[in-house]
Curated annotation (Swiss-Prot):
Protein's UniProt name: Large ribosomal subunit protein uL13
Keywords attached to this entry: Ribonucleoprotein, Ribosomal protein
Gene: rplM
Any one GO MF annotation of this record: mRNA binding
Function field: This protein is one of the early assembly proteins of the 50S ribosomal subunit, although it is not seen to bind rRNA by itself. It is important during the early stages of 50S assembly.
Similarity comment: family membership: Belongs to the universal ribosomal protein uL13 family.
Xref: InterPro entries: Ribosomal_uL13, Ribosomal_uL13_bac-type, Ribosomal_uL13_CS, Ribosomal_uL13_sf
Keyword Transmembrane helix: no
UniProt superkingdom: Bacteria
């Protein structure tokens, strides 16, 4: 008789992946990375455990937005105080913090729960081509 294997955080085999965001479309890249972070690409996916892998994104400043989104897409944030609403276009947000576009897109695709917060910590985004995770020997993850 076959037994159902219950996989938890301790016996999940976490890998490290590196993704080059240069000339990649923001949403398509974010969707793939969110799936890998959640662990949905693994046959042992368990929705109540952190099964996902670690993902390093390089060249985040060179990610593409299609159409007129660079000027027209607006990101809102609120300080919590009256009159504290800030609105920034994607162009302005990219100037202030080049990694924010990718971080916001991927964060929105992961559940907003305690487990989702753990999974978000496995994402490392760098604006340039260099990263500090060479010791983990990350595999390249290709975006189709």
């Amino acid at each position: 008789m076959r037994q159902t294997t219950i996989v938890n955080k301790e016996n999940s085999n976490k890998k490290w992946f590196v993704v080059d965001a240069e000339n990649q479309v923001l949403g398509r890249l974010a969707s793939l990375v969110a799936s890998v972070l959640r662990g949905k690409t693994k046959p042992t996916f368990t929705p109540n455990a952190d099964m996902g892998d670690n993902v390093i994104i390089i060249n985040a400043e060179k990610v593409k937005l299609t159409g007129k989104k660079e000027k027209n897409k607006v990101y809102y944030s609120h300080s919590g105080y009256p009159g504290g609403l800030k609105a920034r276009t994607a162009e302005k947000l990219r100037e202030e913090k080049p990694t924010a576009l990718l971080e916001k897109a991927i964060s929105g695709m992961i559940p907003h729960t305690k487990l989702g917060n753990q999974q978000r910590k496995n994402l490392y985004v760098y604006a340039g081509p260099e990263h500090k995770h060479q010791a983990q020997n990350p595999e390249r993850l290709e975006v189709k």
